[in-house]
């Protein structure tokens, strides 16, 4: 297993290629959701200094993913980007084939993988170049079906060092899927640790780039 409870990945955050703050992915522990053991993973991103005055970002996303198959059991979001605010809490009941929010239930026939549970899942499997992987997710608005593909390798320079990385890109029907808030591209180190060295996340008003600076 390339990660474990207590793993902290800290990043320098760039917004539209300008350094603006920091972000962290942290595996906080194992908890039970609907009677299932799940890794609780927290993602936080926040701006600092002048960037925080011009366009403050204070985002927190928590997921609870299955400890064996790494699909999502629960997802919460607290998004604060400038004047844009959004919160959601989705619980997946796979025995009843529904995803529940505070206001509605949506029928599902898949094991959901949001951006972050998908990303941890990718760390646990061998990834072959040009192989297409298909996933589905629901984050409170609509069901999204998406594909991922390793398109090659790139050398990435980060504050932690230089890494040879596999590049994982989303697409749909041959087109780039990197157009909706929450879509991401990932550069995973081509070694046993499979570290997410670089993450690019599409946000409402631009693109946030995360570059790995510390692992603990």
Question: Could you say what each language-model-derived stretch is?
Answer:
Residues 81-125:
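Hydrophobic, well-structured mid-protein blocks that either form specific transmembrane helices
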Residues 1-92, 127-216:
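Acidic, serine/threonine-rich low-complexity disordered tracts
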């Amino acid at each position: 297993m390339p990660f474990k409870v207590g793993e902290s990945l800290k990043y320098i955050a760039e917004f539209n290629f300008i350094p603006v703050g920091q972000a962290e992915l942290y595996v906080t522990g194992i908890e039970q959701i609907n009677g299932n053991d799940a890794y609780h993973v927290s993602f936080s991103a926040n701006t600092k200094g002048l960037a925080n005055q011009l366009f403050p970002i204070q985002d927190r996303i928590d997921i609870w993913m299955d400890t064996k198959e790494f699909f999502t059991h629960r997802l919460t979001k607290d998004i604060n980007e400038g004047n844009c605010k959004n919160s959601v809490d989705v619980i997946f009941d796979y025995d009843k084939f529904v995803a529940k929010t505070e206001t509605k239930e949506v029928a599902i026939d898949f094991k959901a993988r949001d951006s972050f549970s998908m990303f941890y899942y990718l760390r646990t499997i061998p990834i072959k170049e040009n192989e297409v992987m298909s996933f589905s997710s629901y984050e409170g608005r609509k069901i999204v079906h998406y594909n991922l593909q390793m398109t090659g390798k790139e050398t990435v320079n980060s504050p932690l060092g230089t890494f040879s990385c596999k590049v994982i890109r989303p697409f749909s029907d041959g087109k780039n899927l990197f157009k909706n808030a929450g879509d991401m591209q990932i550069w995973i180190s081509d070694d046993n640790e499979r570290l997410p060295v670089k993450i690019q996340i599409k946000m409402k008003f631009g693109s946030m780039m995360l570059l790995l600076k510390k692992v603990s």
